Amino acid sequence: MAPAFLYSPYKDATISMNWNTNVISSNVTGQMSPVLSVLPTNVRALTLAFATGECGSENWAGVDGGALAAANVPLFTAANVNYVISTGGAAGSFTCGSDAGMATFINRYASNNLVGIDFDIEAGQTQQVINDLVQRVVVAQQNYPNLRFSFTLATLAPSQPGAVMASSWGASAPDSFNIYGDWVMQAIQTYGLKNYTINLMTMDYGSAGPGNCVVANGTCQMGQSAIQAAMNLHDHWGVPYSQMELTPMIGGNDVAGETFTPADADTTAAFVKQNGLVGVHFWSFDRDVDCPPGAASSMCNSIGGVGTLGYTNRFASDLAPGR
């Protein structure tokens, strides 16, 4: 059963993968280890990324889906750690032309600890591919009512000119999505999908201007911009906060000068709890170790001074019930 609230860092399965055993692993502690052996005990879920190709014959950076499932699902169930299977991503597209293929795909990873299927739409998918995915989810969510189906979408965070904090535009809120996000939202409306969440990629806004983010001191304020993106989705598309999740990129983002700090984590988590959003994730688990500011790395945080698994633990603490 998918929990009402889900905190699950993204784990890029291709980073530090044990290619001999296909066991999802990490070097975040400085030593190559199965990821479950280094996951803090207060973090009970991971989002595993990314399955690409056609549903039912999907692969993970060339590893067959069946092989990856066989090597990892038993480990997650033995550890009683929940997981989301994430598809797509920036480097590859996930397609699904049939409901039978979607069933094969989901069943391959099924266990008591599978809590969600995530569709990360950022590889230039066609509108037809997106329409097909949404139609598959309409059927799948009836057959798998305990799973969460999320659409992870790139977003900007257009803010009120001159504002240094997020604030609601109300009915005049701009659309924060690119064409792919628009296509997802249109398909959800066209096909009447009800049981879904929208997971906003609150990162990489581009140049620091109010058309892109909440600006203070000439830089995008990453915590406030995450809040602004959520407000805009709520106000423009009418998505309730109870169907919304946020995924920042910790530390240095791909856009130079954008840095998501531990204080931004606190800001984001407070908004999430106050407004009843249903998920927080981040990109990505393997990056949660210090390295100096500079170009974004897939293996460290490009900010420094946070400590190994500092963001993982900060969010876990911030989001803990009763905090």
Protein language model regions, located:
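Short beta-strand/loop segments at the ligand-binding rim of alpha/beta enzyme cores
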Residues: A2-P9, N80-Y83, P145-S150, V239-L246, ...
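N-terminal carbohydrate-binding/catalytic regions of secreted carbohydrate-active enzymes
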Residues: A2-S111, A265-G279, F285-L319
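Solvent-exposed loop/turn segments at secondary-structure junctions
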Residues: D12-M17, F50-C55, Y83, G88-F94, ...
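Receiver (REC) domain switch-region micro-motif
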Residues: L46, I117, I198
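Substrate-binding and catalytic surfaces of secreted/luminal carbohydrate-active proteins
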Residues: A49, E54, W60-V63, L147, ...
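Substrate-binding cleft of extracellular glycoside hydrolase catalytic domains
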Residues: S57-M165, G170-T190, K194
